[in-house]
Amino acid sequence: MNIVVGTRGSNLALIQTEWVINELKKKYPEISFEIKIIKTKGDLIQNVSLDKIGDKGLFVKEIEQQLLDGKIDIAVHSMKDMPSYLANGLKFAHTPKREDPRDVLILREGYKNLDDLPHGAVIGTGSKRRKFQLLKQRPDLNIVQVRGNVETRIRKIKDENMHGIVLAASGIIRANLQDKISSYLPVDVVIPAPAQGALAIEIRSNDSAIEGIVNSLKDENTEIQILAERGFLDGVNGSCHIPMAAYCEIIQDKIHLTGLYGDSEGKKVVIKSIDGDISSPRELGLKLAKLVLKEYENYEG
């Protein structure tokens, strides 16, 4: 049996895909795997901020089409890039174990954390979620737009005379670049994007043979977290255009879910947390979304 795995062509996307293949090979040594690189709209447009060029799905639509057309058997994505609803005929397989969900600071030599940075320090990020949460901690920071893959963004610190950048810890860890990390941003300082650090394995809805194989990678706790966080995402109808975040913490048989929702200018930002039962994570996410949206509509600053 040969399984064709579709992915974006960035170094990080390939590392993530190879990780999935290696995990599957441990369980199914008799199966051969082949990687197929697919260019997406998000890969082709590098000089414009994500919130200006489209909605969620920017990095997945072309890959999904090849899955529907039967040209690939599995698609591997970063879960945080996935739209709320998948194309007809496609579904998620169970979710593998999540990498560290936090964001990290990668700073110029001489600086270690947010408090070290001088007044007016220039920090690069492509995310409004990160921008407005950092400005809440340090209103003096000059947050600038930065796009590109992990290596490109790190290079831009020097090339564009920035003090540093903010990236997802998961990408840095998977790319084996941990030595570049200056400090981790705690989840109560910068709430991560929903499902940050988790991988999405997408398959055809009617492909039970492939589903049986990839579901062997299921991680129970990750799946609970992702259902809660993406429940919040769906409930607020989140997109690239607005700052939005969610993080689910599992405490024994309970879950603690925090959500953030704001306007595109960062003038109205609501953060709220609720606790619920581990057996209904998606419902808790949807419930928190309703509470946050209600507070957002009545926002007085």
Curated annotation (Swiss-Prot):
Its EC number is 2.5.1.61. It holds the Pfam family Porphobil_deam. One of its GO terms (molecular function) is hydroxymethylbilane synthase activity. GO terms for biological process: protoporphyrinogen IX biosynthetic process. Binds 1 dipyrromethane group covalently. The keyword Transferase applies. InterPro entries: HemC, Porphobilin_deaminase_cofac_BS, Porphobilin_deaminase_N, Porphobilinogen_deaminase_C, Porphobilinogen_deaminase_C_sf. It catalyses: 4 porphobilinogen + H2O = hydroxymethylbilane + 4 NH4(+). GO terms for cellular component: cytoplasm. Its cofactor is dipyrromethane. Keywords: Porphyrin biosynthesis, Transferase. PANTHER family: PORPHOBILINOGEN DEAMINASE. Monomer. Belongs to the HMBS family. HAMAP family: Porphobil_deam. The porphobilinogen subunits are added to the dipyrromethane group. This is Porphobilinogen deaminase. It comes from Clostridioides difficile (strain 630).
